[in-house]
């Protein structure tokens, strides 16, 4: 798939913008705070209806305006798909093929994107919440069912935590209702864990191949999904469900005392190993960056395998964080494969030599000027 164009109205520092893209590599040149990252963010928001940079949608709407509109014409193997997203005081409205979608979950999954920015190196070394968010955002694009289960799980988790606090304060006494919430949470949690394990197994294979090539077969990358459900990777959804049910029963007194749900996919983690050692704890900075790069490149192939379409790749000032060898591997891997958007202060060195016929835009104060091809 590729994004043919983008039309923005009152998004971040863009009052009005219409821009046509190349199917290959699109380079956004400019100094900091000119709007390069905002443009990549707009593509991400058009795809997922939410930002990867902020949880507050009000920040996405231009100062002293009330509504932001994003439009794009997407091309897939099945044909052209016009997309439109409106962000306003009353929430979000999304259209596909000019038809308003009843639920945002019906909209997500049309345009698939993968973003790789310096902060994505924290996939490896950051807190568990970073890796859970990574799994949820990527797997949610690949599987509408995963997205649905995740939405239901979060709703019930919020209700259950609220009820646990009421029990803790003795504002409620009915533990039968707690059992109902626990059963519902276990059902959706089991689906989430099972799908995570299934997709991680595939992602690991792709990432191992990339990692082996980058390290010239000197290192082996492994994934380990950390969960309180024993042998979850070898069992069915039903077994995970029954195990979660039993664990919630065992932990009931402790959870009431603490007023929160202590186990489930919202507490799970993903660990990376290199040659048998935990790379988060014992890996060098170079190993951590190679791991992050391998995972990101593996996502491209996994998304193609799961959806039938290559995603759009957003590289936000990430070249500055990679040495020449890793830059070379990244740019060679994406060449003539996926539509790519790359932000950078300047295009030189490895990037200038390796990128084949890029479409280059100069970004300054929220305006874009296309460079003449060399």
From Swiss-Prot:
InterPro entries: DNA-binding_RecF (IPR001238), DNA-binding_RecF_CS (IPR018078), P-loop_NTPase (IPR027417), RecF/RecN/SMC_N (IPR003395), RecF_2 (IPR042174). GO terms for molecular function: ATP binding; single-stranded DNA binding. GO terms for biological process: DNA replication; DNA synthesis involved in DNA repair; double-strand break repair; SOS response. Its main location: cytoplasm. It is found in: Cytoplasm. It comes from the Bacteria. ATP binds at residues 30-37. Belongs to the RecF family. The RecF protein is involved in DNA metabolism; it is required for DNA replication and normal SOS inducibility. RecF binds preferentially to single-stranded, linear DNA. It also seems to bind ATP. PANTHER family: DNA REPLICATION AND REPAIR PROTEIN RECF. This is DNA replication and repair protein RecF. It comes from Lactiplantibacillus plantarum (strain ATCC BAA-793 / NCIMB 8826 / WCFS1).
């Amino acid at each position: 798939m590729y994004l043919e164009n983008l039309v923005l109205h009152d998004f971040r520092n863009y009052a009005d913008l219409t821009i046509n893209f190349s199917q290959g590599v699109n380079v956004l040149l400019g100094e900091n705070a000119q709007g390069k990252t905002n443009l990549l963010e707009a593509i991400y928001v058009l795809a997922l209806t939410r930002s990867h940079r902020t949880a507050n949608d009000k920040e996405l709407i231009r100062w002293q305006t009330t509504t932001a509109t994003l439009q794009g014409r997407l091309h897939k193997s099945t044909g052209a798909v016009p997309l439109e997203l409106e962000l306003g005081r009353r929430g979000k409205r999304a259209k596909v093929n000019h038809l308003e979608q009843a639920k945002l979950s019906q909209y997500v999954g049309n345009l698939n994107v993968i973003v790789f920015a310096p902060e994505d190196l924290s996939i490896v070394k950051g807190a568990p919440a970073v890796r859970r968010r990574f799994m949820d955002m990527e797997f949610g694009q690949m599987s509408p069912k995963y997205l649905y289960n995740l939405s239901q799980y979060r709703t019930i988790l919020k209700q259950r935590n609220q009820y646990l606090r009421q029990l803790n304060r003795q504002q409620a006494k009915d533990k039968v209702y707690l059992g109902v919430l626990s059963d519902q949470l276990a059902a959706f949690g089991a689906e989430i864990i099972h799908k995570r394990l299934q997709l991680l197994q595939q992602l690991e294979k792709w990432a191992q191949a990339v990692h082996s090539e980058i390290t010239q077969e000197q290192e082996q990358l492994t994934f380990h999904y950390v969960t309180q459900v024993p042998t979850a990777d070898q069992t069915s959804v039903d077994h995970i469900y029954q195990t979660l049910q039993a664990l919630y029963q065992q932990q009931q007194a402790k959870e009431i005392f603490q007023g929160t749900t202590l186990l489930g996919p919202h507490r799970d983690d993903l660990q990376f190993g290199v040659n048998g050692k935990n790379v988060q704890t014992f890996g060098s900075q170079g190993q951590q960056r190679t791991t992050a790069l391998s995972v990101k490149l593996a996502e491209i192939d996994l998304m193609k395998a799961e959806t039938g379409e290559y995603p759009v790749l957003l590289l936000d000032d990430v070249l500055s964080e990679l040495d020449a060898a890793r830059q070379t591997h990244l740019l060679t891997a994406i060449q003539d494969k996926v539509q790519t958007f790359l932000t950078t202060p300047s295009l030189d060195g490895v990037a200038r030599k390796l990128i084949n016929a890029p479409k280059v835009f100069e970004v300054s104060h929220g305006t874009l000027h296309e460079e003449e091809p060399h």
